[in-house]
Every structure is written in structure tokens, then in C-alpha cells.
Design a protein with these regions (language model features):
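Conserved small/polar residues in nucleotide/adenosyl-binding loops
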Residues: 156-158
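Cytosolic juxtamembrane N-terminal segment immediately preceding the first transmembrane helix
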Residues: 1-39, 43
Length: 158
């Protein structure tokens, strides 16, 4: 028999109604908006970055075929479509704070990975495909987080 421990105070929102002044916390709402906006911007940058870099890889010294470049450029979009489903389902399970932290780390890893690997044309195809897949996290996170951002703010109180 397993028992579930209650979340610590402050870890979960017990009651959140942005239209009710008694339960609405303006500072938490604005802090959430700023953090979410930063992560959404990072997600969009990470998702867009490969589409700007991949067509220039052969000019940087790589020797990929057109087919390889096509699949590498398609991977972020394919991954985003798949990962959107994951990023819509996981926040209620893991908690938004943990998901935003995990997403930020993965997006920073992807973005830095592209920045490092294009400087020397020795990266194998599979490694750049992994980076392209990780960049798709940006698209999945962007489309998964964007709809929930408006839940924290009330137009009445702004």
C-alpha cells in the first residue's frame, strides 16, 4: 500500500481564479508571465535556429547531400509535432515549474549545441540530427505552453 504525500505549501496552487480579487496574486501572475515569456521566446529561437543554419552547413565545410540536409531541416518540425502532445500532457502531471525548468535546460543545450558544433565541420550527421530533434522541443513547448499562459492573468486587474 502506498501513500501519497501532500505537496508542500506554496508548491501547488490550491485555488486560482484570476477574476476573483481574493484568490488572485498579482505579483505571482506577473512573475509567471515574465518567466513564461522568456521560455517561450527561447523555445521559438531554438526551434527556428536550425532552419537558418542547416542550409549553410555545406558552406561551413560540411559535405552533406541534399537529402541529408532536407531531413535535418525537417526534423525540428517533425519533433515539434510529436512533442507538442507530450508538452500538453506533462505539465499537469509533473507541474509547470518543473516542466519550464526542464524545457529551459533542453532548449539551452540544443541552442548551445548548434553554436558549438557548427564551428568545426567534424560533427557526424547523427549528432546534428539529434540537435535538430532537440530543437523541435522548442516548437512542441511553444505550442504546448502558449495556451496556458493566459490563465494566470486577468484583463480586469491589469
Amino acid at each position: 500500500m502506498t501513500t501519497k504525500t501532500a505537496p508542500a505549501k506554496g508548491e501547488w496552487l490550491e485555488a486560482w481564479d484570476p477574476e476573483n480579487e481574493q484568490t488572485w496574486d498579482k505579483s505571482l501572475a506577473w512573475r509567471t508571465l515574465w518567466v513564461t515569456t522568456f521560455v517561450l521566446t527561447l523555445a521559438f529561437i531554438a526551434w527556428f535556429l536550425p532552419s537558418a543554419i542547416i542550409p549553410k552547413l555545406n558552406l561551413l565545410g560540411y559535405s552533406f547531400s541534399k537529402g541529408q540536409l532536407y531531413w535535418m531541416a525537417a526534423m525540428p518540425g517533425l519533433a515539434a509535432g510529436l512533442l507538442r502532445l507530450v508538452w500538453m500532457v506533462l505539465p499537469p502531471i509533473m507541474g509547470t515549474r518543473k516542466m519550464v525548468s526542464l524545457t529551459s535546460l533542453l532548449l539551452i543545450a540544443s541552442t548551445l549545441g548548434w553554436g558549438v558544433r557548427v564551428q568545426s565541420p567534424t560533427a557526424p550527421y547523427w549528432e546534428l540530427m539529434v540537435l535538430a530533434f532537440l530543437a523541435g522541443i522548442g516548437g512542441g513547448a511553444f505550442s504546448g505552453f502558449m495556451p496556458s499562459t493566459s490563465y494566470f492573468l486577468s484583463l480586469i486587474h491589469i
